[in-house]
Amino acid sequence: MKHIHILGICGTFMGGVAMIAKQMGYHVTGSDTNVYPPMSTFLEEQGIEIIPNYDVAQLQPAPDMVIVGNAMKRGNPCVEYVLENNLKYTSGPQWLHDHLLRDRWVLAVSGTHGKTTTTGMLTWVLEQNGLKSGFLIGGIAGNFGISARLGDSPYFIIEADEYDTAFFDKRSKFVHYNPRTLIVNNISFDHADIFDDLKAIQRQFHHMIRTIPASGLVLSSASEQSAKETLALGCWSQQQFLGKDNEWFAERITNDASHFAVFHHGEKVAEVKWNVVGQHNMHNALMAIAAAHHTGVAIEDACKALGSFVNAKRRLEVKGEVNSITVYDDFAHHPEAILATLTALRDKVGGGVRILAVLEPRSNTMKMGVHKDDIAPALGRADAVFMLQPEQLSWEVADIANQCVQPAYWNANLDRLVDMIVAKAQPTDHILVMSNGSFGGIHQKILDKLKLK
């Protein structure tokens, strides 16, 4: 049995690679500095040994292959040992391509926003239609309770991330995936720590599109200008578009999009009734329906499957309710995602109740201040705004507070920020916490303080 050792195993992607390798029959071990649930628990349940930190003893005797996570940098003791001793190494995306994806019909879900949700939807649609596909998702799939599976059908569904592959391969991860069905949800400027501008991101998408066969399919939105520009660089595959007067269209039946109609070539085909809200999620669902249709799933059957779809955690996830005040958690950390999430919540709760938006500017792009001027407008649907000033932020959140049209508050101390939120909160309020990190456990802190109010 060949031994694979993974550096940086506890990230969602690398943890998923580990689970798939284990299911393929490899002996899998790994290491990380951040060994914590849920990923550590999932891996241990699979019988995968996790070694804390990067002592080089973990590479003695040498494994057959070292898979290097994209968080690994030169100077890491294990990275230096691998290079010095000429151990065989590769990246996660390259390993997936060489050992798994080249033999499968790959359905890749790409785009700046909505990847995890759409990948989960597509996986569930195929599952409910008897196609037990493999999958690798950048979050814990709500219907499956795991983020990755080998699967036993020809299909493999993968969340196609534009972030770079490894310290030795600065191409986007998705360049390795060679999809036959590609969803391009949207292309916006993000990851300013590795991309200079939007054109640099579009170039990576173009490189992926160049690898799709002529019989393959690219799905994108007719209204998505950045995607159109990218496709104009060259596309040798079939293309289908979402939007009125295009192949695929969805129309809300209820304001919050928990019930919507699906149109194909202008004809209404089916309806979706589900426990998810937001026009952005209706759009995500339409992408999943169209991609599933490419594999032969009937539109009506895809719509029926979505009725029992459970979203990944951290997508407008209710964390608790105290004194008729509801606290939500959401992964939104880009102005476009913040606006979409707030719009979805506003459509759900209506205009007669208050939404308190709580934001931690934590992502690398946020820290650099790239989207600083877009944050206040994105928060426009909230009745009040609360922001944390992280130590490592290069700009002042007070500037955003001053730009907000609604009351806006900030603090550099998490506990003081919690006190400010709780002091302003009233029964029937909806408190929406947005961050791509744990935000210091602020959700539970708010709920605990509300109980004492």
UniProtKB/Swiss-Prot annotation:
Disulphide bridges: none
Gene name of the record: mpl
Required co-factors: Mg(2+)
Record's keyword annotation contains Cell cycle: yes
Catalytic activity, EC: 6.3.2.45
Keyword Zinc-finger in annotation: no
Keywords, in A-Z order: ATP-binding, Cell cycle, Cell division, Cell shape, Cell wall biogenesis/degradation, Ligase, Magnesium, Nucleotide-binding, Peptidoglycan synthesis
SUPFAM superfamilies listed in its UniProt record: MurCD N-terminal domain (SSF51984), MurD-like peptide ligases, catalytic domain (SSF53623), MurD-like peptide ligases, peptide-binding domain (SSF53244)
Organism: Haemophilus influenzae (strain ATCC 51907 / DSM 11121 / KW20 / Rd)
Binding site for ATP: 111-117
GO molecular function annotations of the record: ATP binding; UDP-N-acetylmuramate-L-alanyl-gamma-D-glutamyl-meso-2,6-diaminoheptanedioate ligase activity
HAMAP family: Mpl
GO biological process: cell division; cell wall organization; peptidoglycan biosynthetic process; peptidoglycan turnover; regulation of cell shape
Protein name, as recorded: UDP-N-acetylmuramate--L-alanyl-gamma-D-glutamyl-meso-2,6-diaminoheptandioate ligase
Pathway assigned in UniProt: Cell wall biogenesis; peptidoglycan recycling
Function: Reutilizes the intact tripeptide L-alanyl-gamma-D-glutamyl-meso-diaminopimelate by linking it to UDP-N-acetylmuramate.
Reaction(s) this enzyme catalyzes, per UniProt: UDP-N-acetyl-alpha-D-muramate + L-alanyl-gamma-D-glutamyl-meso-2,6-diaminopimelate + ATP = UDP-N-acetyl-alpha-D-muramoyl-L-alanyl-gamma-D-glutamyl-meso-2,6-diaminopimelate + ADP + phosphate + H(+)
Family the entry assigns: Belongs to the MurCDEF family. Mpl subfamily.
